[in-house]
Amino acid sequence: MGLQRFSFFVTLALVARSLAAIGPVASLVVANAPVSPDGFLRDAIVVNGVVPSPLITGKKGDRFQLNVDDTLTNHSMLKSTSIHWHGFFQAGTNWADGPAFVNQCPIASGHSFLYDFHVPDQAGTFWYHSHLSTQYCDGLRGPFVVYDPKDPHASRYDVDNESTVITLTDWYHTAARLGPRFPLGADATLINGLGRSASTPTAALAVINVQHGKRYRFRLVSISCDPNYTFSIDGHNLTVIEVDGINSQPLLVDSIQIFAAQRYSFVLNANQTVGNYWVRANPNFGTVGFAGGINSAILRYQGAPVAEPTTTQTTSVIPLIETNLHPLARMPVPGSPTPGGVDKALNLAFNFNGTNFFINNATFTPPTVPVLLQILSGAQTAQDLLPAGSVYPLPAHSTIEITLPATALAPGAPHPFHLHGHAFAVVRSAGSTTYNYNDPIFRDVVSTGTPAAGDNVTIRFQTDNPGPWFLHCHIDFHLDAGFAIVFAEDVADVKAANPVPKAWSDLCPIYDGLSEANQ
């Protein structure tokens, strides 16, 4: 009883503190602490004391100065860390992108590092997470919102603030490095940091409060390590207006399948009868369904009783389909309107050997020297750059097309693929055999679909951002098993375009001096 009461008060404290946003200048203290977001107490990684990590906010044009102070002590979740600011282009600050051994050496425990980057031309919904091994699964993951004072969608909603951010988290009772290499499902789904597991049927659920007659811009963020979720709110349609930081033409849906690391803004009109309505986030595998309030939260109208909903789910009739998404403002597709009509086309063949994933016959093994440091030290060609077979130089100012055919040889589909440093045009989506060179959505994480559907997802982007940029499956357990490559973009200009601070240059000597137990 004592532990349960303690866990209840810990949960209350976490909820109370997790709503306070920080930024654009902030200190992030990364530490180990016991948490119980689903009523089960476990050691985890907290940022400024909370799980999920606190909301970071700013506005378009801001300079973000985010000082990461590593005080980690538990080697089973790693003592070092490195943070990726997901969705930001990091033009001129490739060193601040975050992936360990691609863009930097990890920050050692007992040290801090300042991520200092500008966001001149991006606004929308982003997130941040550890980019070292599977560390973000243990708690280092949180939402990041950049507001646009001139938001073209502003007339469509009345409320857009800290209370309208919705995070979806797969939560595990065992630390990622101590559990199975490929877990068969999470113990709980957390919505805004709260949820229930099979062993904690009375744990608190998140409550999202609305007032009748108001329109809310909700920012749905998948901070998942693995599953995708089908998200819906009983009795309400959702109007999607933003996709991964890209404004989109308004699209009315009644459910959203959201893959790991994707984000959507949707407008909800609180025009239904005052009451309580189930918010649902059903994972694609593991403990599915909603029995006893699992995979759920509560939408509560002002004036409704403090009670769990009694609403029932209806069959989705207008689910979100990616090919129905289009940018709000015209965004020309790089290249010419034919398959392969680009300066450089690459096909990525996926494989798996029971332990590791492969792309074009290479599994990504983190190099001891970060790719950016290799380039700054003079490495220029694929032959020079490590890991061998996993680094693809891309020419400057060129159009690039990547095909990612789904295959039964790479189990665990659909695999959501994320490209760092860019948003890309999705010219062929999962579930579709047609190519759209006119007005496809641009985004930074795309589902590569399933072999059963014969999917051959195809994306395009322009090389306008010198630096090494990771492309990888965002199922963190798959990334840790090598499901990644690096694009070394415009290698000749990387050094001039990305001046590195001295503190960055100090990271590797410090990290390389650590014993394995202190890494």
Swiss-Prot record:
Binding site for Cu cation 1: 84, 418
Sections of the chain in a coiled coil: none
EC code: 1.10.3.2
KW Secreted (keyword) present: yes
Positions that bind Cu cation 4: 415, 473, 478
GO molecular function annotation: copper ion binding; hydroquinone:oxygen oxidoreductase activity
BP terms from Gene Ontology: lignin catabolic process
Pfam families recorded: Cu-oxidase, Cu-oxidase_2, Cu-oxidase_3
Entry's localization field: Secreted
Record keywords: Copper, Disulfide bond, Glycoprotein, Lignin degradation, Metal-binding, Oxidoreductase, Repeat, Secreted, Signal
Signal sequence interval, chain numbering: 1-20
Family: Belongs to the multicopper oxidase family.
Protein name: Laccase-2
Upper lineage: Eukaryota, Fungi, Dikarya, Basidiomycota, Agaricomycotina
Gene: LCC2
